[in-house]
């Protein structure tokens, strides 16, 4: 098959797959607002208002474009929902093109000279992309106004562009693909941060393309550097840029005495001059790689510039104006999700610190100062008491991998893992009344008459008299594996590859929201006798049984790919 014929087939079948996806999602689209955040996203998109942190300005601007086509106010929700329909259909299109690119890279790829080879090649790409089209979770997101449909589109575009960059990496056009990737990465911040998750996979594409001999040291370094690039963009580049704008604004207004917004304008001018002279110098000195690196950072910031919409609309005092991020400092707090409870990934407080009181050595810690404009003085003033403003959790209740951290869910944690151990403090051991109460409580525990909520209430009431142990490391690992991974990830995964019980909200019981396979002996081990289900349960419209076939085919595909192209296997595993 000639290259021209291949392009015709690739484009024609790709757009046909797009049309199938568009018809599927368009004919099943939600006509109004659905549960959770969809109603807020519809309202904030249609009128360009400020939603909950961390915001999705590019998503909202696209939603406003779709809202323009509403024939009446009653149709606004439907038209904004169509944004997800088109985003998901384009995702399937780029997935088809991604599969054809990957198939061409396999070592045993044939030239497609015969009709049967061409049908097998393009047919497999169509089956793969349409299988994703009809999968449970993707279809669900494709028909309502949520950020995940467009975020998935960004993932698909980024990975496809990474493969196109690989094709032309050492040509004159190669760097243009890198700059487009950088721009879309910046753009993803205006939709959902999950777009950044393609960076490690794209980094490994670069490594395998440029280093033909793969060593253990080089492989590990490439993975670490790719992950570091992700963290630098997410945790350093963009927060530092916002912080620079915020500090410049306060400095030039409060210290120099300039009017409001002067610091923001000066900061923007400084950044412009940095890129202008940086690009001019590197071009003059023929520093090609450094010049490309500066351009890549510039394109990330250009994509991120959709965030300018948020303070513009916040200053317009829109009806929905959550947190009112009207200047650079407030925008940084909005980006950093400062309104939500702080969580620790590797080391931090457990939920048991609610029973322990403040840390005895350092009971208070500083909060972050919050600046607001004082129009009388023409300066920014701190409006909160930030010195020693926050209670510091008891350091005895800090631990590694604090999965059991939320004090609001203490009772559920203890129901799920195990109750916390406790002993009477030495100074109260002679109190007979207290001892009797605790002995009675322990008897009730032995009888099985105490649940997590009652245990939690007991610890709250008697915590001044008790030494209460923090959850063990193994309790945290158990919760992570069984609930966070098993129930909140693996269950969703299996909905798509083995089957789904129903669309009822799961309560960690055997009746609702579980994955099933359709194979009685397997389902009965986990969910009880499936033959005794009533007609309502059996006829639930969300009930699907795939008999593990997609799951088994996926495993076979992974094994096949690993055997024939281990490099491509690792790239796809990182992306997955």
In which residue ranges do the predicted regions lie?
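Perimembrane helix-loop-helix junctions
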Residues: 166-167, 198-226, 231, 236-264, ...
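Membrane-interface transmembrane helices that cradle and orient dolichyl/undecaprenyl
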Residues: 108, 115-119, 158-177, 206-214
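Start-transfer (signal-anchor) and selected internal transmembrane alpha helices
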Residues: 1-24, 112-126, 269-302
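Transmembrane-helix motifs of polytopic, lipid-linked glycan transferases
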Residues: 15, 82-114, 157-161, 552-559
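Extracytoplasmic catalytic/substrate-binding loops of multi-pass membrane glycan-assembly enzymes
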Residues: 29-41, 51-63, 78, 321-323, ...
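Short hydrophobic alpha-helices at membrane interfaces in multi-pass membrane enzymes
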Residues: 123-126, 161, 168-186, 215-228
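Transmembrane signal-anchor helices characteristic of membrane glycosylation enzymes that use polyprenol
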Residues: 6-35, 132-134, 192, 230-235, ...
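Loop-to-helix entry region of an early transmembrane alpha helix in multi-pass inner-membrane enzymes
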Residues: 57, 70-93, 97-98, 110-114, ...
């Amino acid at each position: 098959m000639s290259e021209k014929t291949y392009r015709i087939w690739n484009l024609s079948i790709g757009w046909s797959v797009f049309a199938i996806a568009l018809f599927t999602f368009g004919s099943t689209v939600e006509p109004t607002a659905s549960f959770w955040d969809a109603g807020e996203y519809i309202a904030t998109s249609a009128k360009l208002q400020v939603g909950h942190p961390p915001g999705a300005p590019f998503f909202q601007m696209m939603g406003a474009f779709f809202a323009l086509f509403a024939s009446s106010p009653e149709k606004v929700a439907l038209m904004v929902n169509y944004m997800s329909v088109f985003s998901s259909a384009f995702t399937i299109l780029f997935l088809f093109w991604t599969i054809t690119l990957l198939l061409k890279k396999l070592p045993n790829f044939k030239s497609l000279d015969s009709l049967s080879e061409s049908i097998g090649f393009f047919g497999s790409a169509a089956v793969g992309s349409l299988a994703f089209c009809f999968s449970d979770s993707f279809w669900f997101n494709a028909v309502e106004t949520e950020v995940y449909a467009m975020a998935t589109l960004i993932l698909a575009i980024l990975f496809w562009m990474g493969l196109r960059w690989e094709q032309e990496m050492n040509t004159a056009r190669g760097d243009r693909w890198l700059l487009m990737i950088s721009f879309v990465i910046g753009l993803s911040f205006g939709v959902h941060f999950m777009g950044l998750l393609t960076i490690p996979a794209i980094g490994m594409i670069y490594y395998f393309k440029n280093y033909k001999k793969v060593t253990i040291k080089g492989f590990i370094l490439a993975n670490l550097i790719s992950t570091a690039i992700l963290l630098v963009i997410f945790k350093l580049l963009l927060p530092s840029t916002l912080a620079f704008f915020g500090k410049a604004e306060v400095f030039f207004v409060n210290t120099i005495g300039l009017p409001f917004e002067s610091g923001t304008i000066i900061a923007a001018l400084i950044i412009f001059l940095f890129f202008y002279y940086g690009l001019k110098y590197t071009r003059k000195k023929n520093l090609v790689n450094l010049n490309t690196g500066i351009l890549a950072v510039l394109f990330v910031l250009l994509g991120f510039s959709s965030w300018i919409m948020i303070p513009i609309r916040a200053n317009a005092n829109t009806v929905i104006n959550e947190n009112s991020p009207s200047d650079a400092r407030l925008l940084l707090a909005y980006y950093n999700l400062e309104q939500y409870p702080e969580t620790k990934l590797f080391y931090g407080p457990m939920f048991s610190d609610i029973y322990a009181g403040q840390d005895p050595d350092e009971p208070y810690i500083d909060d972050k100062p919050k600046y607001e404009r004082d129009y009388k003085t023409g300066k920014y003033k701190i409006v909160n008491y930030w010195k020693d403003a926050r209670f510091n959790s008891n350091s005895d209740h800090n631990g590694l991998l604090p999965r059991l951290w939320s004090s609001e869910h203490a009772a559920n944690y203890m129901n799920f893992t195990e109750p916390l151990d406790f002993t009477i403090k030495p100074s109260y051991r002679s109190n007979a009344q207290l001892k009797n109460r605790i002995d009675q409580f322990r008897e009730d525990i032995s009888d099985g008459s105490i649940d997590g909520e009652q245990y939690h209430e007991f610890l709250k009431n008697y915590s001044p008299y008790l030494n209460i142990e923090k959850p063990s490391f193994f309790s945290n690992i158990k919760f992570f594996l069984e609930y966070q991974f098993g129930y909140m990830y693996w269950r969703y995964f299996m909905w798509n590859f083995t089957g789904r019980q129903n669309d009822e909200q799961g309560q960690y019981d055997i009746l609702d929201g579980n994955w099933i396979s359709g194979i009685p002996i397997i389902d009965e081990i986990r969910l009880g006798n499936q033959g005794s289900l009533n007609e309502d349960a059996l006829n639930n419209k969300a009930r699907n049984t795939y008999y593990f076939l997609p799951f088994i085919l996926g495993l076979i595909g992974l094994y096949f790919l690993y055997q024939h192209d281990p490099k491509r296997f690792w790239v796809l595993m990182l992306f997955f």
